[in-house]
Amino acid sequence: MSDHADTLLGKDTTYPEHYDPALLQPIPRERSRETMVRGDLPFTGVDIWTAYELSWLDSSGKPHVAVGEFWVPADSSAIIESKSLKYYLNSLNQHRFATREQARQAIAGDLSEAAGGEVQVTLFDIDDYSNVGTLPGTCVDTLDAPVYVYQPDASLLKFVDQPGEQQQLFSHLLKSNCPVTGQPDWATVWVQCSGLTLVPESFLAYVVSFRGHQDFHENCVERIFTDLMAGGKLQDLAVYARYTRRGGLDINPLRFSGAQDPEALEQLVSKRIARQ
């Protein structure tokens, strides 16, 4: 099913009782990129993880909880295998930190070491994280495509030579599958592009084509990005997916080309969707 036999996925493991950064398992990004990208990366971006089950003890032994947000840069050398991150976070449950900031710094240092890049960590109070929203643009899910297939097929993407305003399209129908366990991964995928006009029905068909595909969230988004870039003479492109949570974690990869409006990107990633 995959060559990720060295990960925790699909294996019975014992939950840790003590803080252990060694639980984190990196997976080199180059494993997937070598088949998609030649030369310099055509994108930049970030993988935004949300940790809903995060707790530790203070110096008196009192438990604290938070929602954690981890920003892993797309140019880091590795992604972090999700089950290993879950077990790492559970290893914090009985560990004592003198302050909340000490806990944040420890998590940031451990994740940065595992990812091979500087990971930004923010800890939110539970009552400050009720930010459910919607994505901007047009949902294509009410349209009908001429054909549906269930393995990724870039030839499904169609463009028309009618340059116009910047497009924003999204679909709630993205489904991919874990490359180790085969478990389904559900997501909403959003694209923003300028240059040639992307035919919305073709984007719908392309999104559906991932339904039988097995790969990690980050790799799926990068494939969508490279297929869109290859299919049309686009001036700018951004691809963003918000995956539903599993094991108390969700992963939300964002990839974009060129210069993007920082304020617009901040507004885009600041909201989670209802399924999360």
UniProtKB/Swiss-Prot annotation:
Catalytic activity from the UniProt record: 7-aminomethyl-7-carbaguanine + 2 NADP(+) = 7-cyano-7-deazaguanine + 2 NADPH + 3 H(+)
List of catalytic residues: C178, D185
A GO BP entry: tRNA modification
Pfam families xref list: QueF, QueF_N
GO MF, any single term: preQ1 synthase activity
Record keywords: Cytoplasm, NADP, Oxidoreductase, Queuosine biosynthesis
Positions bound to substrate: I80, E81, S82, H217, E218
EC number: 1.7.1.13
Transmembrane segments: none
Binding sites annotated in the UniProt record for NADPH: S82, K83, R246, G247
Cellular component terms (Gene Ontology): cytoplasm
Pathway terms, separated by semicolons: tRNA modification; tRNA-queuosine biosynthesis
Subcellular compartments: Cytoplasm
UniProt superkingdom: Bacteria
Top EC group: oxidoreductase
NCBIfam families associated with the record: QueF
Record text on subunit structure and interactions: Homodimer.
Described function: Catalyzes the NADPH-dependent reduction of 7-cyano-7-deazaguanine (preQ0) to 7-aminomethyl-7-deazaguanine (preQ1).
Similarity field: Belongs to the GTP cyclohydrolase I family. QueF type 2 subfamily.
Name used for this protein in its record: NADPH-dependent 7-cyano-7-deazaguanine reductase
Organism the protein comes from: Teredinibacter turnerae (strain ATCC 39867 / T7901)
